[in-house]
Amino acid sequence: MRAVIPYKKENAKSRLSTVMTREQRETFVEKMLLDVVATLKEGGIRNIDIITTNACDVKKEVKANIIEDDTDLNDCLNKYLSQKEEPILIIMADLPLVKFSHIEDIVAGKADVTIVPGKGGGTNILFIRKPENFRVKYYGSSFESHCMIAAQQNLSIRVYDSFLASTDIDEPQDITELILHGHGIAKDYAEKRFGKKEGKGRVKISPFNEIPMY
């Protein structure tokens, strides 16, 4: 089996622009990618592909096969799937809370397709046992789309429900979850820039100062 990680560095995570500069965000996504790759390897996956619009965006310390493709996310992933005959795990690069035990549980399932839903109807992880005929449809309510695609092909579906695996880091409040529950270098990076602000409501992040830190 193989894992594939779609990855974009340039001007990434624009919804974090209220709390991070562009350079900080680009560094942050690099560290999240490193965490995801490390987790995959810890979970027993050795064959890892990273699909990116610019191969130069992936640092040399990322031990994975780099595929450069500047087409739409769905187009490049569907092309990738059409060329594979082994089980494929598609995992997003902004999931530093995923643990190796999640990966082990996901790939151990017997269903044809295992889906890890993300916030707001998204899809964070897809495990497809027979990828050559499966086509993905990200954006919008992709969780529902992928369930429908699997059902139309008479494929068995497993929904893997996990708070940590479902928490992608897109918005400032997500960084709170990373600081509270994380375990890797992305958490370390966030902790150097934010503290926890507690009150009567939910815990929030609070920048240590307003001067950009690199």
From Swiss-Prot:
Pfam families: CofC. Pathway: Cofactor biosynthesis; coenzyme F420 biosynthesis. It comes from the Archaea. Belongs to the CofC family. Its EC number is 2.7.7.68. It catalyses: (2S)-2-phospholactate + GTP + H(+) = (2S)-lactyl-2-diphospho-5'-guanosine + diphosphate. Signal peptide: none annotated. This is 2-phospho-L-lactate guanylyltransferase. One of its GO terms (molecular function) is phospholactate guanylyltransferase activity. PANTHER family: 2-PHOSPHO-L-LACTATE GUANYLYLTRANSFERASE.
